Amino acid sequence: GLLSGCSNYFNPGIRRDGEAEPARKSDDDIRPWCNQDTVMQPFTPSDPDFYTTDAITDHAVSFLDECGAGEEPFFLYLAHCAPHFPLQAWPEDIKKYRDRYAVGWAEIRQRRYARLLELGLIDPRWGLPAADERSEASYAGLGEHAVEAMAVYAAMVDRLDQSIGRVLDKIRDLGKEENTLVLFMSDNGGCAEEIHNTPHLPPGTIDSYQT
């Protein structure tokens, strides 16, 4: 896992043959990773399909195979980095959300309200409040780059959701779902940093480092 706050999701280390230079917070900022007692700096994955969220989940599932199959209790602390910056995600995940954020503030707002009603999370008597014109105008002025950034962020959360699902599926496969307490927590809030080291590139790729 990662010892510091964030790193490139596709390649935390140095450039691999045939690939672009992995973007970093600064040119000489090589983040340390560890595996058990071994610290790796740089950590350059040999797998070209490496993605941090997937890799952390792979280790969690392996741990459950090793320690969760017996009668002894187990404790798994699974600390994902996503959706912390940099904004990087698989293209197939980004594609799911690109059109969703391009429809505009009013339409997004209406769809979210309809979804809350569909899920039964709010009473139909709770109407959708009048829109704040300032918010709509602010959203309209964001531009295509910000809309793409929102799609990438959503894609990172989507992959995180897939990963948590894999862990829960493994617990079920082991027959431990009725005897396992699962707690999900999230820290931080909105990003307080503005980092656009690669303004000429769209967010999401290995050579792009943006918040």
Model-derived regions, located:
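Formylglycine-dependent
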Residues: 1-98, 103, 111, 117, ...
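Residue-level detector of family-conserved "landmark" positions at structurally sensitive sites
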Residues: 126-127, 181
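Generic, well-ordered alpha-helical scaffold segments in large soluble proteins
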Residues: 63, 115, 119, 156-159, ...
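Short, solvent-exposed beta-strand-terminating loops
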Residues: 6, 123, 189
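Beta-strand elements within well-structured catalytic alpha/beta cores of enzymes
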Residues: 60, 74-80, 153, 157-160, ...
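Surface-exposed helix-capping loop/turn segments at secondary-structure junctions
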Residues: 66-74, 123, 166-179
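Histidine-centered active-site microenvironments of extracellular/periplasmic hydrolases
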Residues: 88-89, 169-211
